[in-house]
């Protein structure tokens, strides 16, 4: 730890156990001890080795207020915390560790983080879970009738805020609520039903820890930070991305550009991609030459031929009995 962090300028301290009990009946001494160990000792390990000039930015959680008995809205950063379960208690302890450390810190108390992710989306977060169920035409159970109030925040805005705090040298040794939406569970379910009317909403009397609360975001907005993403559009995206897709199972598929616009200046041809681009390469080949290429089963590659013509020969090398396929690909 010392080797990595001793001369670091900024630390985004995200480490922690996130598979945590949501209600008392889910808790156990073994789980609680693991959550506490990783949170408290892990954080202290970082604080012990970073320099005074290093800025540490740590996500805390709205759950530090889970012990509030009555519905309360617009909770400020300086209100007394009331954690109950191990996760909230560990984050509450982390906040005190940073405040007492004498180091340059920023604490962001996150609402429930929602939004589509290309890698490991947190399905245990209510808006994400509801969107996943809605994408499969499932039933959304509304515990306590869905009356609980939730403070939510978009995933991409959380990432943007971490970068914002990293770059703002004038913000230090401070804590901010990072929430955007205050809604009920039922309102989230109704948005899901708007984008997939096939789902069923079922109200139940199951246990809930409380009827909810919300955090004020006035302080974070006063820094100049702006939220750019919306709950309804995020839910629509998650339902769409997680719904059944008519996927092309061919090893390779050739498709011409679409939505063409042609005039005297030339032609515009469009190719719509369904996923983020993480790399772009340019290949130039001379006439009569040969190139070899490979990609792994979990990858997708998309190639746009802008000039000339190629003859392709390809095969699934994981399957020795697969056929060798030959095809001609033209520009565009």
How would you label these PLM feature ranges?
Residues 247-277, 292:
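A short, N-terminal "cap"/entry segment at the start of jelly-roll beta-barrel domains
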Residues 1-38:
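NAD(P)H-binding glycine-rich loop region in Rossmannoid oxidoreductase-like domains
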Residues 298-317:
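Glycine- and acidic-residue-biased ligand/ion/polar-headgroup-sensing regions
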Residues 13, 44-84:
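Conserved Rossmann-fold NAD(P)-dependent oxidoreductase catalytic core, especially the SDR/UDP-sugar
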Residues 96-150, 155-159, 164:
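NAD(P)-dependent short-chain dehydrogenase/reductase
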Residues 30-45, 81, 85, 89-90:
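Glycine-rich NAD(P)-binding loop of the Rossmann-fold in SDR/ketoreductase-type enzymes
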Residues 317-332:
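Short acidic-glycine-tyrosine-enriched beta hairpin
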Residues 138, 143-256:
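C-terminal substrate-binding subdomain of Rossmann-fold SDR/epimerase-dehydratase oxidoreductases
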